[in-house]
C-alpha cells in the first residue's frame, strides 16, 4: 500500500499521539523515503495538532516548531532514537500484512 494511516485514524488520535505520528511520519518520509500517510492525511494531522497544541504534553513537543506546522513539514528535525525505532517497526509490521 502507498499509505497506511488515514484521515479516520488521525481523527481518533489524542493530542500527544498527533505529536508521535507527526514525528514518525516525517522520519519515514524524509529519512527513509517511505510515505505512511497521504499528503491530505498529514495535512489534516497538522491541522489537528495546531488546534490542540496547548493540550500537548508530549516529551518531544519541543522538537516541533510553529514553522514546521505552518509549512506542514518535519524535514529538518533531528529525530530521537525512539521515533526512528517506532517508524522502522511500523513499516516492518505493515509489510507483514
Located regions from the model:
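Phosphate/adenylate-binding "loop-and-lid" substructures adjacent to NTP/NAD/dNTP-binding pockets
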Residues: 1-97
Amino acid at each position: 500500500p502507498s499509505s497506511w494511516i488515514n484521515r479516520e485514524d488521525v481523527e481518533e488520535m489524542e493530542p500527544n499521539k498527533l505529536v508521535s505520528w507527526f514525528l514518525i511520519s516525517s522520519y519515514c518520509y524524509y529519512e527513509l523515503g517511505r510515505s505512511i500517510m497521504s499528503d491530505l492525511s498529514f495535512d489534516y494531522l497538522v491541522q489537528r495538532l495546531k488546534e490542540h497544541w496547548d493540550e500537548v504534553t508530549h516529551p518531544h513537543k519541543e522538537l516541533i516548531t510553529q514553522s514546521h506546522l505552518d509549512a506542514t513539514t518535519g524535514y529538518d528535525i533531528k529525530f530521537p532514537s525512539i521515533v526512528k525505532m517506532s517508524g522502522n517497526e511500523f513499516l516492518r509490521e505493515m509489510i507483514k500484512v
